[in-house]
């Protein structure tokens, strides 16, 4: 099974997300587009860990030529390859290496701890600072610049999902 191409993306209200990197990891796993397997891309050589689970929406494409990225706010780390149904609540604008590389912020629909988190305004402000700090600094040790351009609401995140699905279909 190819995790990128064989799994439906879900809907804008409940996306399917494949976890690549567990919360707390320094290992940077990525989906191998040809095999559909999750492969070790590199080990981060910084003191930072991923603040939450990180993955992608299958059958999507984004401006960086990869699937649409998603940071899933979880209480406990999930293993790479796990399928999680998520509600998009925000999106972080990002420019990485001159390319748009936005990150959807989502919550698992199966975790009652996040039942009240429906939009950007429902996310703890410190959590947002933590996310923005991580993505703004995690490549500095490699002398690479990443620019974060701020958060947008759930509506913008859902629009990104729809656009990502459309871009994938157009590229097929």
Residues covered by each model-derived region:
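Hydrophobic N-terminal alpha-helices or hydrophobic patches in metabolic proteins across all domains
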Residues: 1-172
């Amino acid at each position: 099974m190819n995790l990128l191409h064989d799994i439906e993306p879900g809907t804008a209200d409940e996306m399917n997300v494949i976890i690549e990197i567990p919360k707390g990891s320094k290992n940077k796993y990525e989906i191998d587009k040809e095999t559909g397997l999750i492969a070790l891309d590199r080990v981060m050589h910084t003191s930072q860990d991923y603040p939450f689970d990180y993955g992608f929406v299958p059958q999507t494409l984004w401006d960086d030529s990869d699937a649409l990225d998603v940071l899933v706010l979880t209480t406990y780390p999930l293993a790479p390859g796990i399928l999680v149904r998520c509600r998009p609540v925000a999106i972080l604008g990002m420019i990485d290496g001159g390319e748009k590389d936005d990150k959807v912020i989502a919550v698992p629909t199966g975790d009652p701890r996040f039942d009240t988190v429906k939009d950007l305004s429902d996310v703890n402000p410190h959590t947002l600072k933590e996310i923005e700090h991580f993505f703004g600094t995690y490549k500095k040790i490699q002398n690479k610049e990443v620019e974060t351009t701020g958060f947008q609401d759930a509506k913008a995140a859902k629009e990104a999902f729809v656009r990502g699905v459309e871009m994938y279909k157009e590229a097929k």
